């Protein structure tokens, strides 16, 4: 605004929307490439899918927060959950040294 009284001309912009190409240029891998990655284990069995899981719990001894990151299958995470619900506990590094 340049004057004491604003005018409509000062608020109208000269911008116009530009068309955007929404086509995805991503190329999928050939299925023959998956065989080279090693999806099959040494015994010919397919490897189970793994993922990162973050575990936040308290130290059994002092109660401080302990954070773990594991890479496992869902079945093994359930097994770990059952162990932690039982007698298996996690302690922090400072309590582990004592």
UniProtKB/Swiss-Prot annotation:
InterPro entries: Papilloma_E7 (IPR000148). One of its GO terms (molecular function) is DNA binding. It comes from the Viruses. There is a cross-link at residue 1 (Peptide (Met-Gly) (interchain with G-Cter in ubiquitin)). Keywords: Activator, DNA-binding, Early protein, G1/S host cell cycle checkpoint dysregulation by virus, Host cytoplasm, Host nucleus, Host-virus interaction, Inhibition of host innate immune response by virus, Inhibition of host interferon signaling pathway by virus, Interferon antiviral system evasion, Metal-binding, Modulation of host cell cycle by virus, Oncogene, Transcription, Transcription regulation, Ubl conjugation, Viral immunoevasion, Zinc, Zinc-finger. Residues 1-41 are annotated as: E7 terminal domain. Highly phosphorylated. It is found in: Host cytoplasm; Host nucleus. A motif (LXCXE motif) lies at residues 22-26. GO terms for biological process: DNA-templated transcription; symbiont-mediated perturbation of host cell cycle G1/S transition checkpoint; symbiont-mediated suppression of host innate immune response; symbiont-mediated suppression of host type I interferon-mediated signaling pathway. A zinc finger (unnamed) spans 59-95. GO terms for cellular component: host cell cytoplasm; host cell nucleus. Its main location: host cell. Pfam families: E7. A motif (Nuclear export signal) lies at residues 77-85. Homodimer. Homooligomer. Interacts with host RB1; this interaction induces dissociation of RB1-E2F1 complex thereby disrupting RB1 activity. Interacts with host EP300; this interaction represses EP300 transcriptional activity. Interacts with protein E2; this interaction inhibits E7 oncogenic activity. Interacts with host TMEM173/STING; this interaction impairs the ability of TMEM173/STING to sense cytosolic DNA and promote the production of type I interferon (IFN-alpha and IFN-beta). The E7 terminal domain is an intrinsically disordered domain, whose flexibility and conformational transitions confer target adaptability to the oncoprotein. It allows adaptation to a variety of protein targets and exposes the PEST degradation sequence that regulates its turnover in the cell. Plays a role in viral genome replication by driving entry of quiescent cells into the cell cycle. Stimulation of progression from G1 to S phase allows the virus to efficiently use the cellular DNA replicating machinery to achieve viral genome replication. E7 protein has both transforming and trans-activating activities. Induces the disassembly of the E2F1 transcription factor from RB1, with subsequent transcriptional activation of E2F1-regulated S-phase genes. Interferes with host histone deacetylation mediated by HDAC1 and HDAC2, leading to transcription activation. Belongs to the papillomaviridae E7 protein family. This is Protein E7. The gene is E7.
